[in-house]
Amino acid sequence: MSFLRPPSMEELGAAAVSRPVASERKTMPIDRVFWSHFSPNLGPGGWVTGALLVSLGLDFRFGLLAIVIGNVVGALPVALAAAIGPPTGLTQMEASRRALGRLGVRPPAFLNWIYCVGWDAVNNVPAATALIAFLSIVAGAAPPFWLALGVLATLQMVASIYGHDMVQALQKYLGAALLAAFTVIGLQSAWHGVALPHAAHPPGIATMLLAVAILASFNLSWASYSSDYTRYLPAETPPGRVVWLALAGLLGSAVPFQILGLLTAASIAEPSPTAVIASLQHAAGPLGPMVLAVIALSSITGNAFNDNTASYSLISAGVHIPRVLAAIVTALLGYGLAVAGAGRYAALYTDYLVVTMYWIAPWIGIVLADWYFGDRTVHPVPPGWTRGASIFMIVSVATILLFSTSQLYTGPVARWLGGADIGYYVGFFVAALWYGRSGARPRGWKADA
Protein backbone atom coordinates (compact mmCIF):
# COMPACT_ATOMS: atom_id res chain seq x y z
CA MET A 1 0.00 0.00 0.00
CA SER A 2 1.31 3.46 -0.92
CA PHE A 3 0.97 4.94 2.56
CA LEU A 4 3.31 2.25 3.94
CA ARG A 5 6.07 3.16 1.48
CA PRO A 6 8.45 5.67 3.13
CA PRO A 7 9.03 8.93 1.24
CA SER A 8 12.30 9.07 -0.68
CA MET A 9 14.76 11.89 -0.07
CA GLU A 10 15.04 14.46 -2.81
CA GLU A 11 18.42 15.16 -4.39
CA LEU A 12 20.48 17.45 -2.17
CA GLY A 13 22.56 19.24 -4.80
CA ALA A 14 21.81 22.70 -6.20
CA ALA A 15 21.81 21.45 -9.79
CA ALA A 16 18.76 19.26 -9.15
CA VAL A 17 16.62 22.38 -8.64
CA SER A 18 17.32 23.79 -12.10
CA ARG A 19 16.83 20.49 -13.92
CA PRO A 20 13.42 19.06 -14.83
CA VAL A 21 12.31 15.97 -12.93
CA ALA A 22 13.43 12.81 -14.73
CA SER A 23 10.57 10.98 -16.44
CA GLU A 24 11.11 7.81 -14.39
CA ARG A 25 10.53 9.81 -11.18
CA LYS A 26 7.30 11.43 -12.38
CA THR A 27 5.04 9.00 -10.55
CA MET A 28 3.16 11.24 -8.11
CA PRO A 29 -0.51 10.26 -7.56
CA ILE A 30 -2.78 13.01 -8.84
CA ASP A 31 -4.75 13.26 -5.57
CA ARG A 32 -1.67 14.93 -4.04
CA VAL A 33 -2.49 18.03 -6.10
CA PHE A 34 -5.57 18.55 -3.95
CA TRP A 35 -3.79 17.96 -0.64
CA SER A 36 -0.77 20.12 -1.48
CA HIS A 37 -3.09 23.06 -2.16
CA PHE A 38 -5.48 22.28 0.68
CA SER A 39 -3.39 21.51 3.75
CA PRO A 40 -1.17 24.64 3.94
CA ASN A 41 -4.30 26.75 4.52
CA LEU A 42 -5.27 24.73 7.59
CA GLY A 43 -4.52 27.05 10.48
CA PRO A 44 -5.70 30.13 12.34
CA GLY A 45 -4.85 32.43 9.41
CA GLY A 46 -8.13 31.82 7.62
CA TRP A 47 -10.10 32.43 10.80
CA VAL A 48 -8.23 35.70 11.33
CA THR A 49 -8.96 36.84 7.78
CA GLY A 50 -12.66 36.11 8.14
CA ALA A 51 -12.86 37.92 11.48
CA LEU A 52 -11.03 40.89 9.97
CA LEU A 53 -13.97 41.51 7.62
CA VAL A 54 -16.19 42.47 10.54
CA SER A 55 -13.63 44.97 11.81
CA LEU A 56 -13.67 46.51 8.31
CA GLY A 57 -17.42 47.12 8.67
CA LEU A 58 -18.86 44.27 6.59
CA ASP A 59 -22.00 42.46 7.67
CA PHE A 60 -22.56 38.75 7.00
CA ARG A 61 -24.05 39.21 3.52
CA PHE A 62 -21.28 41.44 2.19
CA GLY A 63 -18.65 39.48 4.09
CA LEU A 64 -19.77 36.25 2.43
CA LEU A 65 -19.78 37.95 -0.98
CA ALA A 66 -16.24 39.25 -0.41
CA ILE A 67 -15.07 35.79 0.68
CA VAL A 68 -16.40 34.08 -2.44
CA ILE A 69 -15.16 36.72 -4.91
CA GLY A 70 -11.79 37.25 -3.21
CA ASN A 71 -10.95 33.57 -2.99
CA VAL A 72 -11.91 32.79 -6.57
CA VAL A 73 -9.88 35.77 -7.82
CA GLY A 74 -6.86 34.77 -5.75
CA ALA A 75 -7.05 31.00 -6.30
CA LEU A 76 -7.55 30.88 -10.06
CA PRO A 77 -4.03 32.09 -11.03
CA VAL A 78 -2.53 29.61 -8.56
CA ALA A 79 -4.52 26.71 -10.03
CA LEU A 80 -3.59 27.72 -13.59
CA ALA A 81 0.08 27.84 -12.55
CA ALA A 82 -0.17 24.32 -11.14
CA ALA A 83 -0.73 22.97 -14.66
CA ILE A 84 2.76 24.17 -15.67
CA GLY A 85 4.45 21.58 -13.44
CA PRO A 86 3.72 18.27 -15.20
CA PRO A 87 4.89 19.13 -18.74
CA THR A 88 7.98 21.08 -17.63
CA GLY A 89 9.02 19.07 -14.59
CA LEU A 90 10.30 22.32 -13.08
CA THR A 91 9.71 24.33 -9.93
CA GLN A 92 7.53 27.40 -10.34
CA MET A 93 10.48 29.80 -10.30
CA GLU A 94 12.53 27.78 -12.76
CA ALA A 95 9.53 27.45 -15.07
CA SER A 96 9.25 31.25 -15.23
CA ARG A 97 12.69 31.54 -16.82
CA ARG A 98 11.09 30.99 -20.24
CA ALA A 99 9.52 34.45 -19.87
CA LEU A 100 12.17 36.18 -17.76
CA GLY A 101 15.43 34.53 -18.82
CA ARG A 102 18.02 32.79 -16.68
CA LEU A 103 19.22 36.08 -15.22
CA GLY A 104 15.79 37.72 -15.10
CA VAL A 105 14.35 34.98 -12.90
CA ARG A 106 16.76 35.84 -10.08
CA PRO A 107 14.97 38.92 -8.64
CA PRO A 108 11.55 37.22 -8.23
CA ALA A 109 13.25 34.06 -6.94
CA PHE A 110 15.11 36.08 -4.29
CA LEU A 111 11.91 37.94 -3.38
CA ASN A 112 10.13 34.61 -3.04
CA TRP A 113 12.81 33.35 -0.70
CA ILE A 114 12.37 36.45 1.50
CA TYR A 115 8.62 35.96 1.32
CA CYS A 116 8.88 32.32 2.44
CA VAL A 117 11.07 33.30 5.38
CA GLY A 118 8.44 35.87 6.41
CA TRP A 119 5.59 33.38 6.22
CA ASP A 120 7.72 30.94 8.19
CA ALA A 121 7.81 33.44 11.04
CA VAL A 122 4.15 34.45 10.74
CA ASN A 123 2.95 30.85 10.91
CA ASN A 124 5.22 29.93 13.80
CA VAL A 125 4.33 32.76 16.21
CA PRO A 126 0.75 31.58 16.91
CA ALA A 127 1.81 27.92 16.64
CA ALA A 128 4.48 28.32 19.31
CA THR A 129 2.02 30.23 21.48
CA ALA A 130 -0.47 27.37 21.15
CA LEU A 131 2.21 24.76 21.94
CA ILE A 132 3.21 26.60 25.11
CA ALA A 133 -0.42 26.75 26.27
CA PHE A 134 -0.92 23.07 25.42
CA LEU A 135 2.13 21.95 27.41
CA SER A 136 1.15 24.11 30.38
CA ILE A 137 -2.18 22.23 30.52
CA VAL A 138 -1.05 18.64 29.91
CA ALA A 139 2.42 18.78 31.50
CA GLY A 140 1.96 21.56 34.04
CA ALA A 141 5.01 23.43 32.74
CA ALA A 142 5.24 26.13 30.10
CA PRO A 143 8.49 26.15 28.09
CA PRO A 144 9.95 29.50 27.05
CA PHE A 145 8.82 30.84 23.69
CA TRP A 146 12.22 30.35 22.04
CA LEU A 147 12.25 26.66 22.99
CA ALA A 148 8.71 25.89 21.83
CA LEU A 149 9.44 27.73 18.60
CA GLY A 150 12.70 25.81 18.21
CA VAL A 151 10.94 22.44 18.45
CA LEU A 152 8.46 23.37 15.71
CA ALA A 153 11.11 24.97 13.49
CA THR A 154 13.31 21.87 13.76
CA LEU A 155 10.52 19.53 12.69
CA GLN A 156 9.70 21.79 9.75
CA MET A 157 13.34 22.04 8.74
CA VAL A 158 13.83 18.26 8.79
CA ALA A 159 10.78 17.81 6.55
CA SER A 160 12.09 20.41 4.09
CA ILE A 161 15.56 18.82 4.04
CA TYR A 162 13.97 15.48 3.20
CA GLY A 163 12.28 17.31 0.34
CA HIS A 164 9.33 16.96 -1.99
CA ASP A 165 8.06 13.48 -1.09
CA MET A 166 8.10 14.11 2.66
CA VAL A 167 6.37 17.47 2.25
CA GLN A 168 3.69 15.86 0.07
CA ALA A 169 3.17 13.04 2.58
CA LEU A 170 2.71 15.57 5.39
CA GLN A 171 0.17 17.50 3.32
CA LYS A 172 -1.92 14.39 2.73
CA TYR A 173 -1.80 12.45 5.98
CA LEU A 174 -1.26 15.17 8.57
CA GLY A 175 -3.54 17.40 6.52
CA ALA A 176 -6.35 14.84 6.64
CA ALA A 177 -5.99 14.55 10.43
CA LEU A 178 -5.99 18.34 10.79
CA LEU A 179 -9.09 18.56 8.59
CA ALA A 180 -10.99 16.21 10.88
CA ALA A 181 -9.84 18.05 13.99
CA PHE A 182 -10.59 21.51 12.61
CA THR A 183 -14.03 20.34 11.48
CA VAL A 184 -14.85 19.39 15.08
CA ILE A 185 -13.38 22.67 16.35
CA GLY A 186 -15.29 24.67 13.75
CA LEU A 187 -18.62 23.05 14.52
CA GLN A 188 -18.06 23.49 18.25
CA SER A 189 -17.09 27.14 17.85
CA ALA A 190 -19.97 27.89 15.50
CA TRP A 191 -22.40 26.24 17.91
CA HIS A 192 -21.26 28.43 20.80
CA GLY A 193 -20.32 31.63 19.05
CA VAL A 194 -22.47 32.16 15.97
CA ALA A 195 -23.90 35.66 15.75
CA LEU A 196 -24.46 36.96 12.26
CA PRO A 197 -22.53 40.24 12.02
CA HIS A 198 -24.59 43.32 11.21
CA ALA A 199 -23.51 46.74 9.98
CA ALA A 200 -25.39 50.02 10.29
CA HIS A 201 -24.74 50.87 6.65
CA PRO A 202 -23.71 48.89 3.56
CA PRO A 203 -19.94 49.06 3.01
CA GLY A 204 -18.62 51.51 0.45
CA ILE A 205 -16.87 50.49 -2.74
CA ALA A 206 -13.46 51.28 -1.25
CA THR A 207 -14.12 49.00 1.73
CA MET A 208 -15.31 46.15 -0.48
CA LEU A 209 -12.29 46.52 -2.75
CA LEU A 210 -9.98 46.41 0.26
CA ALA A 211 -11.76 43.35 1.69
CA VAL A 212 -11.64 41.48 -1.62
CA ALA A 213 -7.95 42.38 -2.06
CA ILE A 214 -7.11 40.99 1.40
CA LEU A 215 -9.00 37.78 0.66
CA ALA A 216 -7.52 37.42 -2.83
CA SER A 217 -4.01 37.85 -1.45
CA PHE A 218 -4.63 34.98 1.00
CA ASN A 219 -4.64 32.48 -1.89
CA LEU A 220 -2.61 34.42 -4.46
CA SER A 221 0.38 34.16 -2.15
CA TRP A 222 0.68 30.47 -3.15
CA ALA A 223 1.19 31.30 -6.85
CA SER A 224 4.96 31.17 -6.54
CA TYR A 225 4.80 27.65 -5.00
CA SER A 226 2.27 25.85 -7.14
CA SER A 227 4.18 23.79 -9.70
CA ASP A 228 6.81 22.92 -7.09
CA TYR A 229 4.25 20.32 -6.00
CA THR A 230 2.88 19.21 -9.39
CA ARG A 231 6.14 18.71 -11.30
CA TYR A 232 6.37 15.06 -10.21
CA LEU A 233 3.13 14.25 -12.06
CA PRO A 234 3.53 12.44 -15.39
CA ALA A 235 3.98 14.90 -18.26
CA GLU A 236 0.81 13.68 -19.98
CA THR A 237 -1.44 14.43 -16.97
CA PRO A 238 -4.51 16.32 -18.24
CA PRO A 239 -4.00 19.99 -17.30
CA GLY A 240 -7.72 20.45 -16.63
CA ARG A 241 -7.63 17.88 -13.82
CA VAL A 242 -4.61 19.58 -12.26
CA VAL A 243 -6.31 22.99 -12.38
CA TRP A 244 -9.58 21.75 -10.87
CA LEU A 245 -7.90 19.76 -8.09
CA ALA A 246 -5.69 22.72 -7.14
CA LEU A 247 -8.69 25.06 -7.21
CA ALA A 248 -10.75 22.67 -5.07
CA GLY A 249 -7.93 22.41 -2.54
CA LEU A 250 -7.48 26.16 -2.20
CA LEU A 251 -11.18 27.03 -2.04
CA GLY A 252 -12.06 24.00 0.09
CA SER A 253 -9.79 25.14 2.89
CA ALA A 254 -9.85 28.95 2.68
CA VAL A 255 -13.58 29.57 2.19
CA PRO A 256 -14.95 27.48 5.11
CA PHE A 257 -12.30 28.79 7.51
CA GLN A 258 -13.00 32.40 6.59
CA ILE A 259 -16.75 31.91 6.91
CA LEU A 260 -16.22 30.47 10.40
CA GLY A 261 -14.07 33.50 11.20
CA LEU A 262 -16.89 35.73 9.99
CA LEU A 263 -19.46 33.86 12.08
CA THR A 264 -17.38 33.77 15.25
CA ALA A 265 -15.99 37.31 14.98
CA ALA A 266 -18.25 38.49 17.82
CA SER A 267 -16.49 36.16 20.26
CA ILE A 268 -12.98 37.21 19.20
CA ALA A 269 -11.46 40.15 21.01
CA GLU A 270 -9.44 41.29 17.98
CA PRO A 271 -8.58 39.89 14.54
CA SER A 272 -5.24 38.37 15.55
CA PRO A 273 -4.04 34.76 15.80
CA THR A 274 -3.57 35.02 19.58
CA ALA A 275 -7.14 36.21 20.07
CA VAL A 276 -8.45 33.53 17.71
CA ILE A 277 -6.55 30.84 19.63
CA ALA A 278 -7.96 32.06 22.96
CA SER A 279 -11.48 32.24 21.54
CA LEU A 280 -11.35 28.76 20.01
CA GLN A 281 -9.88 27.28 23.17
CA HIS A 282 -12.66 28.83 25.25
CA ALA A 283 -15.42 27.75 22.85
CA ALA A 284 -14.07 24.20 22.68
CA GLY A 285 -14.42 23.71 26.44
CA PRO A 286 -13.02 20.27 27.32
CA LEU A 287 -11.62 20.02 23.79
CA GLY A 288 -9.44 23.06 24.47
CA PRO A 289 -6.16 21.10 24.62
CA MET A 290 -6.99 19.53 21.26
CA VAL A 291 -7.46 23.00 19.78
CA LEU A 292 -4.01 24.02 20.98
CA ALA A 293 -2.35 20.84 19.72
CA VAL A 294 -3.99 21.12 16.30
CA ILE A 295 -2.94 24.76 15.87
CA ALA A 296 0.63 23.87 16.80
CA LEU A 297 0.67 20.95 14.35
CA SER A 298 -0.87 23.03 11.57
CA SER A 299 2.32 25.06 11.34
CA ILE A 300 4.23 21.95 10.27
CA THR A 301 2.19 21.46 7.09
CA GLY A 302 2.45 25.15 6.20
CA ASN A 303 6.08 25.71 7.05
CA ALA A 304 7.42 22.46 5.61
CA PHE A 305 5.98 23.92 2.39
CA ASN A 306 7.60 27.32 3.01
CA ASP A 307 11.02 25.95 3.90
CA ASN A 308 11.11 23.55 0.97
CA THR A 309 10.02 26.11 -1.62
CA ALA A 310 12.37 28.68 -0.09
CA SER A 311 15.31 26.32 -0.57
CA TYR A 312 14.40 25.99 -4.26
CA SER A 313 13.99 29.76 -4.62
CA LEU A 314 17.30 30.64 -2.99
CA ILE A 315 19.10 28.40 -5.46
CA SER A 316 17.08 29.82 -8.39
CA ALA A 317 18.13 33.29 -7.20
CA GLY A 318 21.71 32.38 -8.09
CA VAL A 319 22.97 31.23 -4.68
CA HIS A 320 24.48 27.91 -5.69
CA ILE A 321 24.60 26.03 -2.41
CA PRO A 322 23.34 22.50 -1.64
CA ARG A 323 19.58 22.30 -1.19
CA VAL A 324 20.01 21.01 2.36
CA LEU A 325 22.03 24.11 3.31
CA ALA A 326 19.44 26.37 1.67
CA ALA A 327 16.70 24.73 3.77
CA ILE A 328 18.72 25.14 6.99
CA VAL A 329 19.49 28.81 6.27
CA THR A 330 15.81 29.49 5.58
CA ALA A 331 14.60 27.78 8.75
CA LEU A 332 17.17 29.58 10.91
CA LEU A 333 16.25 33.00 9.49
CA GLY A 334 12.55 32.26 9.92
CA TYR A 335 13.23 31.26 13.52
CA GLY A 336 15.16 34.46 14.21
CA LEU A 337 12.48 36.63 12.61
CA ALA A 338 9.75 34.92 14.64
CA VAL A 339 11.64 35.45 17.91
CA ALA A 340 12.33 39.09 17.06
CA GLY A 341 8.82 39.83 15.82
CA ALA A 342 6.73 37.82 18.26
CA GLY A 343 5.70 40.90 20.23
CA ARG A 344 4.55 42.84 17.17
CA TYR A 345 2.82 40.16 15.12
CA ALA A 346 0.29 42.46 13.44
CA ALA A 347 3.00 44.85 12.23
CA LEU A 348 5.05 41.92 10.92
CA TYR A 349 2.03 40.66 9.00
CA THR A 350 0.85 43.93 7.48
CA ASP A 351 4.04 45.93 6.99
CA TYR A 352 6.28 43.13 5.77
CA LEU A 353 4.24 40.44 4.05
CA VAL A 354 1.45 42.46 2.45
CA VAL A 355 3.88 44.87 0.79
CA THR A 356 6.27 42.15 -0.38
CA MET A 357 3.39 40.34 -2.08
CA TYR A 358 3.05 43.13 -4.63
CA TRP A 359 5.64 41.45 -6.80
CA ILE A 360 3.64 38.20 -7.08
CA ALA A 361 0.73 39.65 -9.09
CA PRO A 362 2.78 41.03 -12.03
CA TRP A 363 5.11 38.03 -11.97
CA ILE A 364 2.31 35.46 -12.21
CA GLY A 365 0.52 37.61 -14.80
CA ILE A 366 3.58 37.39 -17.07
CA VAL A 367 4.10 33.68 -16.37
CA LEU A 368 0.49 32.77 -17.22
CA ALA A 369 0.38 35.01 -20.30
CA ASP A 370 3.53 33.35 -21.57
CA TRP A 371 2.41 29.79 -20.83
CA TYR A 372 -1.16 29.97 -22.08
CA PHE A 373 -0.76 32.43 -24.96
CA GLY A 374 2.92 32.17 -25.90
CA ASP A 375 4.71 30.08 -28.49
CA ARG A 376 5.85 26.73 -27.07
CA THR A 377 8.12 25.80 -29.95
CA VAL A 378 11.22 24.20 -28.45
CA HIS A 379 14.15 26.63 -28.33
CA PRO A 380 16.81 27.30 -25.66
CA VAL A 381 15.88 29.30 -22.59
CA PRO A 382 16.83 32.99 -22.95
CA PRO A 383 20.22 33.18 -21.24
CA GLY A 384 20.06 36.68 -19.79
CA TRP A 385 17.56 39.41 -18.95
CA THR A 386 14.46 39.52 -21.18
CA ARG A 387 11.99 42.29 -21.80
CA GLY A 388 9.60 40.28 -19.65
CA ALA A 389 11.97 40.69 -16.70
CA SER A 390 12.01 44.46 -17.26
CA ILE A 391 8.21 44.55 -17.39
CA PHE A 392 8.11 42.63 -14.12
CA MET A 393 10.42 45.08 -12.37
CA ILE A 394 8.71 48.22 -13.70
CA VAL A 395 5.17 47.08 -12.89
CA SER A 396 6.12 45.79 -9.42
CA VAL A 397 7.72 49.08 -8.39
CA ALA A 398 4.96 51.18 -9.98
CA THR A 399 2.12 49.33 -8.24
CA ILE A 400 3.83 49.66 -4.86
CA LEU A 401 4.44 53.39 -5.33
CA LEU A 402 0.94 54.14 -6.63
CA PHE A 403 -1.46 51.63 -5.13
CA SER A 404 -0.12 50.06 -1.92
CA THR A 405 -1.83 50.56 1.42
CA SER A 406 0.07 49.81 4.63
CA GLN A 407 1.31 51.37 7.83
CA LEU A 408 4.65 51.91 6.12
CA TYR A 409 3.39 53.67 3.02
CA THR A 410 0.14 54.51 1.19
CA GLY A 411 0.30 55.35 -2.49
CA PRO A 412 -1.45 58.40 -3.99
CA VAL A 413 -4.01 56.32 -5.92
CA ALA A 414 -4.83 54.34 -2.78
CA ARG A 415 -5.34 57.60 -0.85
CA TRP A 416 -7.57 58.90 -3.63
CA LEU A 417 -9.63 55.69 -3.41
CA GLY A 418 -10.05 56.08 0.33
CA GLY A 419 -7.54 53.37 1.21
CA ALA A 420 -8.83 50.78 -1.27
CA ASP A 421 -6.07 48.47 -2.43
CA ILE A 422 -6.37 47.52 -6.10
CA GLY A 423 -2.64 47.16 -6.75
CA TYR A 424 -2.79 43.36 -7.09
CA TYR A 425 -5.37 43.52 -9.86
CA VAL A 426 -3.61 46.36 -11.68
CA GLY A 427 -0.23 44.66 -11.42
CA PHE A 428 -1.54 41.34 -12.73
CA PHE A 429 -3.42 42.67 -15.74
CA VAL A 430 -0.99 45.44 -16.70
CA ALA A 431 1.98 43.07 -16.64
CA ALA A 432 0.15 40.31 -18.51
CA LEU A 433 -1.21 42.63 -21.21
CA TRP A 434 2.05 44.57 -21.59
CA TYR A 435 4.01 41.34 -21.89
CA GLY A 436 1.56 39.89 -24.41
CA ARG A 437 1.51 43.00 -26.60
CA SER A 438 5.21 43.78 -26.44
CA GLY A 439 6.36 40.80 -28.46
CA ALA A 440 8.56 39.89 -25.49
CA ARG A 441 7.54 36.25 -25.48
CA PRO A 442 10.57 34.09 -26.24
CA ARG A 443 9.91 31.86 -29.21
CA GLY A 444 9.59 28.79 -27.03
CA TRP A 445 12.12 27.16 -24.76
CA LYS A 446 13.59 23.89 -23.75
CA ALA A 447 13.31 22.84 -20.12
CA ASP A 448 16.68 21.08 -19.97
CA ALA A 449 18.59 23.65 -22.03
Kindly label every feature range from the protein language model.
Residues 30-47, 186-192, 201-264, 285-304, ...:
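Hydrophobic, membrane-embedded alpha-helices of multi-pass small-molecule transporters
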Residues 55-56, 83, 107, 129-139, ...:
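Membrane-water interface regions at transmembrane-helix termini and the short interhelical loops
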Residues 20-24, 177, 364-436, 441-449:
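C-terminal membrane-solvent junction of multi-pass transporters and transport-like membrane proteins
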Residues 43-46, 69-77, 112-123, 177-188, ...:
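Selective recognition of specific alpha-helical transmembrane segments in multi-pass small-molecule
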Residues 105-139, 299-316:
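Hydrophobic transmembrane alpha-helices that form the core helical bundles
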Residues 1-60, 207-213, 231-241, 441-449:
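Membrane-interface "cap" regions at the ends of multi-pass membrane proteins
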Residues 66-100, 109-122, 436-443:
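Juxtamembrane transmembrane-helix boundary signature
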Residues 109, 137-162, 176-187, 215-226, ...:
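Transmembrane alpha-helical segments of multi-pass small-molecule transport proteins
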